[in-house]
Amino acid sequence: MAETANNGELQNVTLKDIFEQIKEVFSTYISSYVHILNKFIGILRKVSTMRFERSTLIKYVKKLRFFNETLLNYEFPLLTSSDITTVRLQVKAIGSFFIKFLEMQDILNYYLTQSVQNEVISKTLNYKLNFPDAAIERIEDSYNHFVKFTQWMMQSLLIDDELSQIEVIQFSIKCAVEDNVDLTQTTNIFLQEVAPVESLAEYMELSEEWVAILKDLIARMENEFSLAVVQWTEATEKKK
């Protein structure tokens, strides 16, 4: 709670700052997708047979922009106390929004890295118009960590009801149980248990560490996206 600060109000401002950092990193993550999808849509405009896929991706871009605008317009309240109950209410509210976004993102990632990839090969016979394997790996790794962070930010504060579950984590646990996987020895990030924090000071410290990790993952993903754009551009220029 307030043991790391003599003034409770200062502690509350710090909590608000932490929430703003989390909000910013999610916004950056969403913006990265909007940017690369717009680039990819521009490339697909040159391929008449990919009209349906292009239209679907445009719909996803609109959804992503909606999520981002909603997030950016949201103002975190200035907490009047560092009471854990008050913080839980705030975390549950923003966590629920993140879960809604991530469930859609899961479908988008599948569509982008599986369905569209197959259609590109089938309709153009040009594999260089696809996302490179390195970019797909970054997409998956970044998504997995954003999912795990969202689970952590809620469950570390003992927010763990039926409406706060994330499908990909629940499915991973179900499969692990059926396969008799030792959950204490697994390297699967979705199967790793979330330990509750002992104080809000610890929660804030770990949140900042998480934000740093997520920022690094976004930077790595954006680097692969830039390389993908170069590949697509070169592939389409050769056809002129």
From Swiss-Prot:
Its main location: cytoplasm. It is found in: Cytoplasm; Nucleus. One of its GO terms (cellular component) is nucleus. Keywords: Cytoplasm, mRNA transport, Nucleus, RNA-binding, Transport. It comes from the Eukaryota. One of its GO terms (molecular function) is RNA binding. One of its GO terms (biological process) is mRNA transport. Homodimer and homotetramer. RNA-binding protein that binds specific mRNAs including the ASH1 mRNA, coding for a repressor of the HO endonuclease. Part of the mRNA localization machinery that restricts accumulation of certain proteins to the bud and in the daughter cell. Belongs to the SHE2 family. This is SWI5-dependent HO expression protein 2. The gene is SHE2.
